[in-house]
């Protein structure tokens, strides 16, 4: 797979960004026939996947990827529960930082629903911008995790204005880097749909390689904290389980999406199972933080009937 061309990725996986980039490498027809070195100049479409989940019509409204939509709606509920639990741990280390991270993931899931389900349909003028925002939010989450990974080393005081400025500053940098890489890549599509090919080198490096490095550093930091600081193998298990779900999700999404789609007769695709794995990955991120901060409460905290916080 060349990083300057998403043809091999988009032919297997119906990613939203595939609708706003082009490739002269191949075209996959409805009968799965591949045409190499074709001229897509007059086609007002992006790179077509070999197989994708079928859409449904409800009240004259077309909804794409209904199975994946249900998973993402369920993910919203999971994230809301996680946010509630984080808010209940009043004195936990990194409470504000992880609260901010999961708020970002909540926003990311909302934009994922917008681009995956056809709220902003492919081919519309707004679609490239929504896709760029979604990619930008994914980058912001990765950059936020990078900073949160260092909280266990007590390099700075958590929850302070300085700490939150650092976290929000890095998340903003991550958002801008991924958003600009995306929107500049999509610019030729926005200006002229008849372009023959899209150079995606910068998009691949920023969105895939750079964010992967950030996640790798976060995992290494968490493993170091679990082994040498908290010395709790339950933390190690949560980290490794999160890595397992993340890797499994990427493999199912990018490696076996077409096989899954054909096997279940177009009712589901790899994005469905990838989204499930992403939910479990986020749950393990929360659980890792939850276990490492389990003993932070040195006194009991309760809320009276007036909503005031009581410290005992």
Curated annotation (Swiss-Prot):
Superkingdom assignment: Eukaryota
GO molecular function: unfolded protein binding
Subcellular location: Endoplasmic reticulum membrane
Membrane topology term: Multi-pass membrane protein
GO cellular component assignments: cellular bud neck; endoplasmic reticulum membrane
GO biological process: cell wall organization; chitin biosynthetic process; endoplasmic reticulum to Golgi vesicle-mediated transport; protein folding; protein transport
Entry function: Chaperone required for the export of the chitin synthase CHS3 from the endoplasmic reticulum.
Protein name: Chitin synthase export chaperone
């Amino acid at each position: 797979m060349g990083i300057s061309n998403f043809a091999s990725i988009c032919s297997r996986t119906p990613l939203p960004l595939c609708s706003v980039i082009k490739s002269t490498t191949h075209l996959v027809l409805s009968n799965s026939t591949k045409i190499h070195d074709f001229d897509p100049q007059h086609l007002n479409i992006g790179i077509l996947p070999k197989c994708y989940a079928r859409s449904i019509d409800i009240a004259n409204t077309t909804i794409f990827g209904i199975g994946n939509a249900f998973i993402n709606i369920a993910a919203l509920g999971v994230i809301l529960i996680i946010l509630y639990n984080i808010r209940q741990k009043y004195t936990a280390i990194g409470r504000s930082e992880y609260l901010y991270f999961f708020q970002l993931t909540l926003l990311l899931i909302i934009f994922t629903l917008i681009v995956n389900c056809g709220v902003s349909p492919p081919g519309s003028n707004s679609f490239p911008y929504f896709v760029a925002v979604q990619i930008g939010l994914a980058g912001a989450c990765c950059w936020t995790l990078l900073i949160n990974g260092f909280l266990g080393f007590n390099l700075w005081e958590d929850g302070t204005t300085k700490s939150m400025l650092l976290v929000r500053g890095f998340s903003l940098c991550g958002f801008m880097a991924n958003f600009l890489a995306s929107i500049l890549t999509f610019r030729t599509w926005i200006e002229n749909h008849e372009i023959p090919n899209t150079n995606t080198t910068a998009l691949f490096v920023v969105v895939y390689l750079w964010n992967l490095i950030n996640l790798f550093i976060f995992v290494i930091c968490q493993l170091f904290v679990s082994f040498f600081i908290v010395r709790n193998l339950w933390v190690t298990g949560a980290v490794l389980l999160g890595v397992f779900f993340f890797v499994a999700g990427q493999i199912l999404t990018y490696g076996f999406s077409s096989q899954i789609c054909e096997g279940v007769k177009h009712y589901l695709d790899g994005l469905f199972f990838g989204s499930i794995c992403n939910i479990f990955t986020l749950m393990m991120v929360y659980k890792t933080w939850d276990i490492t901060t389990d003993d932070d409460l040195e006194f009991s905290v309760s809320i009276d009937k007036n909503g005031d916080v009581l410290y005992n």
